[in-house]
Amino acid sequence: MSSQDLEQFRIFNKKLETEKDIKPILNAIKSLFDYKPAAEAKITLSNVGISNIVRCLNVQDKSNDDLTCEVLKICFEKFGVGDVVKHFTSHIMYLLRHEKNCVRRLAVDEVYKSVIADVSLLPVPEYIDIFVAVAQMVCDKDVGVANKAIIITSNLQFEAYPKVLEEMKIALEHNSSSKCNAYEVVINISLKSYELFKLSVDNGYIEHMVEELKSNDVLYQLNILELLSRLSVKPYGINYLVKDGALERITALIGDLRNNPLGGLLLPGYIKFFASIAHYYPKEIFEKYPIFLNSLFNAIESGEQTVLPVALDALGFIGITIEGKLCLTAVGSPFIQAIEKIGQLIRNSPAEIKIRALYCYASLISVEKDTPSQGPVDHRVTLMTREWFRSLNKESDAMETLLGICKIPFPDIKLAAYSLLDAVCQHLWGEELVARVAGFVEFLLDRSINEPKEAKEAKYDIIKRLSQSSVFDDNILTRFKTYVKEGPFYSDTTLQVAMEEGN
């Protein structure tokens, strides 16, 4: 900025101390800096400072608070990432604790930009007070401020957390929403390392979460279960929940749901929680916590709409792994009954349940989604999945039933049906069934069917898989390979346009 502009800012700055009507002065400062180059404005602001502007937020007349925020925002935009916090640390501390939402939002945004860009921009020893102040803002009444505080506090350097976690406990004295925000930070950092998890345990957060499951607030309980399920995927997380007895206590809560008038609302959350653990540790969960399996199978058998979608997702998530499939089949008749029930749901349910049931079935049949598995498929799995697929329709032909569902014109149902067909075609027995059912190959190769982009891509992947099969004759294999070569979106119109362009 020119020396004239610098002097003008000094005059405006001085007037903020003496004039009662500060609105025209703030507008003048706003106009002065609005279009000035950042490099010039930064020098002026660094030399003169922003104390008098900030002081405008500390007067009895609050009518100019929004305008003051606008002026400060323009000033802050002239600085690089992290520089505002470095140059005006004490001011940022004041702004973070201000009663006005827009003021706190302005300050937390500056810290957010710094931490997200490079957490090392603000060394912990120098800025620990800033980090503590932000951590306590996870219980801010302004949702935007609270959400930014969660992200910032979840991404600090390790050495900040002993102090931050200690001071963030203030959130546990607030309402359930604030406590959940603090829990979210705790889970976010606990997933990063065992050391941070241990720090969270030592500060009592995890134990507090488990105890809070006794709350009568349904949404609060479900949020806690969701967060604990994220923690349980870590070996140290599940080990703690088991050794501390937390899993036993959570299991007991499932047993109490039948006596709880809100049990129907809570059961989906508990099923989802245990399914997230059983996905990784099916054998241990099935053996030690049979009440979970009973609740899962009962939910599927009952057909209760409030819990059925989650139960179908949960069973599919458990059964997507090879170990999950083997553990489920070891359960015996309760699982077989569940499979048969899912077959009925696929055939006779409204669209939403039909789709969930199809995806559940696809997960149970598929053997390629279990990434850790290597080598040939276990022969037991081949036999099991073939038998499970027959349960799609025991009174008729299961593959003909699937063909009929694939022909349903609704895009979401068609896509789910293709997902199941793809899972079936991962097996030799599945390829043989496709070859055996009259009209199935012709249906797959028929490009005249009006299908959305996702369905065309899904069908293309199935045909690509079948083009490598040994169960079809040479003529069909040639047609499959031609289809693959032409791509998922080829049509006679495409050929006609290409020929016209060639001519």
Label every model-predicted segment.
Residues M1-N58, L165, S491-N503:
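N-terminal "cap/leader" segments of large eukaryotic alpha-helical scaffolds
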Residues E70-V71, F79-V81, D109-E110, I152-T153, ...:
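Alpha-solenoid helical repeat scaffolds
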Residues R10-T18, I50-N58, K62, T89-R97, ...:
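HEAT/HEAT-like alpha-solenoid repeats
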Residues I29-K36, T68-E77, E110-D118, I152-F158, ...:
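Hydrophobic residues within the alpha-helices of tandem HEAT/HEAT-like
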Residues A246, A252-I413:
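Eukaryotic tandem repeat interaction scaffolds
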Residues I22-I25, D65, R104-R105, A146, ...:
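Residue-level detector of extended alpha-helical repeat arrays and alpha-solenoid scaffolds
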Residues N101, V111-N294, E304, A311, ...:
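Solenoidal tandem-repeat scaffolds enriched in leucines and small polar residues
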Residues S3-Q4, A39-V48, F79-H87, S120-I128, ...:
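Short, hydrophobic/charged alpha-helical patches characteristic of ARM/HEAT alpha-solenoid repeats
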